[in-house]
Amino acid sequence: MRGLSIALAALGLGLATPLLAEPSPSVQVQVEAALAEAPKGTRFGLLVVDEAGKVIASVNPDQRFIPASNTKMFTTAAAYALLPGMDQPDVAGGTQVALRPGGNKHVPDVVLVGRGDARMSSASDCKVDCLTTLADAVAAKTKVVRDVIGDDTAFPDERWSPGMSWNNIQTEDGTAAGALNLDDNQLKVAVVPGVVGKTPTVTVPAYYTVNNEARTVAASSTPTLALERAAGSNRLRVYGEIPADSKDWHQWIGIDDPALYTAWTFKGLLQARGVKVIGQPRSANRSRDPLIDRACDTCGVGFAISGTPEPFASLTPPPLAEDVVIIDKVSQNMHAQVLFHRVGAHIGTGSTDWSVKGLQQVFAKAGIPREGYDFSDGSGMSTYNRVSPRAVVALLRWIDAQPWGKSWYASLPIAGVDGTLKHRFIGTPLAGNLVAKTGTLNATNALSGTFRAASGKRLTFAFFANDVPDGQTALPTMEAVLLGIAASN
C-alpha cells in the first residue's frame, strides 16, 4: 500500500522517552500486505510502540483522523487529571431539590437542580442516586406545589455536540445531554403485533405522543418496522410492517430536553405520593454567552449560577470513577458528554469552549503535540474531532505514569471478555489480552490501547480507519494487522 510513512528515530511522542529506531522491515511488510486487502479508498493511521518507545509499526502516524469514540479516552483522562475525588462519592454532582416561593396563593414551585450527574434513575428498583428519594423529601415537606422545574443552568444550553449528524438526534446514541439528566435521557418504545391487517400495539411513556401507521402482516414476513421523530418534537411516527409471529419489538429513542423530561417524571412521582401539582413541568436553561465565557477568564475555578434557591435535599451519586467505566466499557455517549462539561465547569462556565480548554490544559502538561488533536465534544459523536495516532499513543503512555493510570486502564474493554470488545478477537491470542477503546462512526473505525505480544512485551497502539466505503468495514483488516504484530513480536 503506497503512502505508508515509517517513523524515524528522531520523531518523539512528546514524552520523556522518545521513539526509538524504525519499525522492523518484516513487520512493516506484513502490515502493508494486510492493509492492501482493505476496502479500496480507506485511509489508515497506525502507530505501535513497545515499552521502551521503540516503533514497531507506523502508518501515517502524524496524519489526523476522525477518532469516533476514541475521543472518550481523552475526556475520561482529563477528568481524572482535573476533577478531585474521582474515587469518592460524587457529592459535587448530585441533583438537589428546592422550593421556590410562588405568587399563586403562596404555593411554591419545586425545583430540581441539576449539577452534572449522568446516572440519576427513576426505575422502581433503583437503590442509589434515585429520583424517588427527592420525591419522598418533597412529599414530607409539602402537599401542594405549583410548577415542577428542571433547572439545567449549571451548564450552558449546548445539548448536542457541534458537528454531530442531525439524524442521530432521535436515537439513544445522539440523545441530548445537560446538567440535569434522568434514565440515560432515553425512552423505550415497544411494539407488539396485532391481528393481521390491523395496527400493532405501541407502548411508550406518555411524554411522547404516537402516530401509529404500522401494520401487522402475515407470520414469517420480513419486518420493516421503523421509528421517526423530528428534532424538537415529542411526536413519534411508527410505520412499516411487523409479522404476526414477531417477538416483541423495541427500540430506545433520545430525549431533546432532559431537564423537561426529568420535571415531567418528577411531577408523576409527586402525584403518586399525594402531592398536588397545580402547575406544569418545565425546564430552565442557560443560553451560551460568549461574553460570560470570556469574562470567566478571571472567575477562578468553577462558575456559580446566582438565584438558585437553597436546596433541602440532595442525592449523592457513586464515584465518577465508576461512571468512567460505563463511559469506556460500553461507550456511553451521553455520560461522556456530561463528564466533558463537568471538566469545563470545574475550570470555567461549563461550555464546550471551556471543556475543550480543560482538555488542552491536561494534554499540554502531558506533552501531547497540540497539532495532534482538535476536539468539539467529549463523546466522539462530532465529525469535527481529529486526532493523530501519535497523539493517542502519547496519551496512553502518559496515563501509564499517572497515579490513577491503573484505574483508568481498568475502564477499557477487554477483547473477547466485556464491553464493546466482548465479541471481538474470540479464539485468538488477543482475547483476554488486548485492552482498548473502540470507535465507530460513519465511514470510521478506531481502536487504541495495549496488548501483550507473543514475546510478552507490552505494546501500545493507536489504529484508525477513515473514509471506509459505504456498506463495508475495516475491522477484519485492522484485527488481522494487530494479530500479525502480536505474533511477530
Predicted feature locations:
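Bacterial N-terminal signal peptides that target proteins for export
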Residues: M1-A7
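Short beta-strand scaffold segments in enzyme catalytic cores
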Residues: L46-V48, G93-A98, S448
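Conserved serine DD-peptidase/penicillin-binding transpeptidase domain
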Residues: E22-P25, V29-A34, A81-R370, A454, ...
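A short, well-structured edge-of-sheet supersecondary motif
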Residues: L35-V59, R282
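Small-residue-rich helix-loop
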Residues: I56-V59, V330-N333, Q337-N489
